[in-house]
């Protein structure tokens, strides 16, 4: 099984636990796992040309594509892109989706759309697998979709997260001014932030944890560090103080590191 990178630890771990050999960016694998609407942590989207290339490659080489369409609902800066499943005509692609981001996180209702070749293999075994989602929740969700509420809910949340991401970007820029680099994609609920930092990522994370802040580090060098900031679960009013706290933590860590170097 090939993943685009090593960031999706939960997914690669599941396959590894079931005896699959996990690799990264290897097109010669039998299974290719991709998230076209979430190619990077900051919301880059796989273009149609690349999707068609992947679909044609999988068809020609007999490989199976697993399309995890995570956050495909939150595309702000371009028109929605056709899914790999749709472009492939339902062949050689398994489509995975979830409603947890659109509805309550506690409603863990996900779904999988199989190509016809796999449906025939799955049908005789379907009764051997227990459904973990509540029947009541499934029925309520079905009615919710049937009545058209999911469409309006998606539009509402798309506007909400687009505005929140813009507000977060403005808060970061206000606090760090020109001393930072911000990346946002066409979709998603996160941005990447690169700031000057001479202390190692582990020390920065520990300092942040002591202040009640959890950091996700994408990359670090001897002179700077790149973080992922999410706007999904934090109120807009907390963006500015959170950014200021992050800057204080970073400045204090770097100052302490510089002082230690001088003393040594």
Predicted feature locations:
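Active-site PLP attachment segment
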Residues: 85-121
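Conserved PLP-anchoring active-site segment centered on the Schiff-base-forming lysine
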Residues: 1-10
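Active-site phosphate-binding strand-loop segment of PLP-dependent enzymes
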Residues: 9, 15-76
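Conserved glycine-rich beta-strand-loop-beta hairpin in the small C-terminal domain of fold type I
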Residues: 159-169, 180-194, 224
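Helix C-cap/helix->beta junction micro-motif
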Residues: 60-61, 91, 211, 253
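Structural signature of PLP-dependent enzymes
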Residues: 123-129, 147-169
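Conserved PLP-binding active-site segment of the aspartate aminotransferase-like
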Residues: 114, 192-197, 214-249
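Active-site C-terminal subdomain of aminotransferase-like
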Residues: 118-137
